[in-house]
């Protein structure tokens, strides 16, 4: 279905900080066809609970900060995941996530006073795996990849062998002044894949007033072309095209970005793929 005369965005400055669920970049407000990314913020002194359902999507609840209990139910039964999350900030340790399949209802209740969760979803129809799967810090694969001025740390949450069918996710940590998402992915030059590739980065900086630069050159899934460089700050989000999208941390900053993407093939770099699988 084509949307005519619809204003869309491909970069959000700090997003919406209201409590509850707030969409960040979705097909409703951005040049995306399938991938949706948002945030759930809860506070026991404000919005103290969130109830949702996945519909025909697989959903990743990626806990950024705080701890919560999540109860999920579906045709397979009911399961409660207690005390998910360990971090006081995204730089302080490895993440905890929960993958939910289609036709699942869920309720999130904070354990700590506040909890902040990134939410990514993709339609899967009947192909989705129904039983929820927790991805705890010990399940996250950590790689150091690149060399020279583009060495970075990658925390692989949902790789090709993970419990999700279509969704891939992880975190990349750029040390001060260094680059990541480079060199090119193996398939970046294959423009025929553009309609099947969508990716969103959610950025965090240390210190909170820090910054980075995001280069974007290529095609969105809508075949819209992009060629720009944007300043990214703590809490920003951006759509990445099929093509070039390297990131550099500012000279006084560390940058951590969370990546969510859908792709028809694994996202690898040929130079070190044999050793590390190579992600962002």
Which residues make up each language-model segment?
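Short, structured patches in soluble enzyme cores that scaffold and shape functional sites
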Residues: 102, 110-112, 119-123, 158-159, ...
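Double-stranded beta-helix
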Residues: 89, 113-156, 215, 258-280
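Acidic/histidine-enriched, beta-strand-rich ligand/metal-binding domains
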Residues: 193, 204-205, 209-280
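Extended, compositionally biased flexible segments
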Residues: 29, 33-110
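A short glycine-rich, His/Asp/Glu-containing loop-to-beta-strand
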Residues: 15-50, 148-200
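Conserved hydrophobic/aromatic beta-strand scaffold that supports enzyme active sites
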Residues: 37-41, 60, 97-99, 119, ...
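Glycine- and acidic-residue-biased ligand/ion/polar-headgroup-sensing regions
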Residues: 55-83, 100, 176-177, 188-234
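Conserved metal-binding segment of the jelly-roll/cupin
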Residues: 91-111, 122, 231-252
């Amino acid at each position: 279905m084509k949307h005519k005369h619809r204003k869309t965005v491909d970069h959000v400055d700090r997003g919406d900080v209201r409590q509850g669920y707030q969409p960040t970049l979705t097909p409703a407000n951005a040049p995306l066809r399938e991938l949706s990314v948002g945030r759930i913020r809860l506070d026991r002194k404000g919005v103290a609970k969130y109830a949702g359902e996945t519909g025909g999507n697989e959903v990743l609840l990626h806990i950024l900060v705080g701890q919560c209990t999540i109860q999920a139910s579906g045709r397979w039964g009911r399961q409660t995941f207690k005390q998910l999350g360990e971090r006081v900030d995204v730089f302080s340790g490895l993440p905890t996530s929960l993958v939910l399949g289609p036709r699942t209802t869920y309720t999130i209740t904070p354990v700590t006073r506040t909890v902040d969760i990134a939410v990514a979803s993709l339609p899967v129809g009947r192909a989705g795996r129904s039983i929820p799967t927790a991805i705890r810090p010990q399940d996250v694969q950590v790689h150091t990849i690149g060399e020279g001025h583009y060495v970075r740390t990658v925390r692989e949450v949902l790789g090709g062998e993970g419990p999700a069918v279509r969704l891939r996710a992880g975190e990349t940590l750029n040390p001060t002044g260094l680059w990541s998402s480079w060199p090119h992915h193996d398939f970046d030059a294959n423009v025929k894949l553009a309609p099947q590739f969508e990716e969103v980065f959610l950025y965090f900086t240390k210190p909170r007033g820090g910054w980075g630069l995001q280069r974007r050159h290529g095609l969105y899934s809508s075949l819209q072309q992009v060629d720009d460089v944007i300043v990214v700050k703590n809490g920003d989000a951006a759509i990445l095209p099929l093509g070039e999208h390297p990131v550099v941390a500012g000279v006084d900053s560390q940058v951590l970005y969370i990546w969510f993407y859908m792709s028809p093939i694994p996202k690898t770099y040929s130079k070190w793929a044999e050793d590390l699988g190579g992600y962002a």
